Swiss-Prot record:
It catalyses: Cleavage of hydrophobic, N-terminal signal or leader sequences from secreted and periplasmic proteins. SUPFAM superfamilies: LexA/Signal peptidase (SSF51306). It comes from Paracoccidioides brasiliensis (strain Pb18). Residues 34-197 are lumenal. This is Signal peptidase complex catalytic subunit SEC11. Disulfide bonds: none annotated. Glycans are attached at N41.
Length: 197
């Protein structure tokens, strides 16, 4: 097996160039993702619909484009949120909005300089109740234990601004079958390294 790699090891400069080209492709993709995150103000500017809870609006496997620059979310808007303590994005529609009363302050326990204290924020945060279009009940059962609504600033990843149907099935297949991901990455890496210019 090692004898088949001998022609590639004979010219280490070409092999190094190919490895660096592969690293350049990966770093460019990473920079594009981070740039898109900054532009949209979202940690995940592109997500895939993982369930059928939003049918008929979105099907499982649809690729969604998010925007998180709006200070408020309107009732009827479709948002993506993360449940506290879990890293699974959920795509559902806002059913109700509970704005904070003017002049009321949010209080959080914050450690400052090693001491625990209370920090007040004069910027009110919008509270939201969501529901999947294809679900019978609202999402209070999906929220973290003791959570009755979503916090606009803490829980919302972004609002849906566009989508491409069924393209996300590749992501679903790769997450449901980890061996397929390894095979695909190995194949791509092998093709880059073995490619001759």
């Amino acid at each position: 097996m090692l004898s088949s790699l001998a022609p590639y090891m004979a010219n280490p400069r070409q092999t190094l160039t190919q490895v660096l080209n592969f690293a350049l492709v990966l770093s460019t993709a990473f920079m594009l993702w981070k740039g898109l995150s900054v532009i949209t103000n979202s940690t995940s500017p592109i997500v895939v619909v993982l369930s059928g809870s939003m049918e008929p609006a979105f099907q499982r496997g649809d690729l969604l484009f998010l925007w998180n620059r709006s200070p408020r979310v309107d009732v009827g808007e479709i948002v993506v949120y993360n449940v506290r303590g879990k890293d699974i994005p959920i795509v559902h529609r806002v059913m109700r909005s509970f704005p904070e009363l003017p002049g009321r302050e949010d209080k959080k326990n914050v450690k400052k300089g090693g001491e625990e204290g209370e920090e007040t924020s004069s910027t009110p945060s919008q509270k939201l109740l969501t529901k999947g279009d294809n679900n019978m009940a609202d999402d209070t059962e999906l929220y973290a234990q003791g959570q009755e609504y979503l916090d606009r600033k803490e829980d919302i990843v972004g609002s849906v601004r566009g989508y491409v149907p069924t393209v996300g099935y590749v992501t679903i297949l790769l997450s449901e079958h980890p061996w397929l991901r390894s095979v695909l990455l190995g194949f791509m890496g092998l093709m880059v390294v073995l490619q001759r210019e």
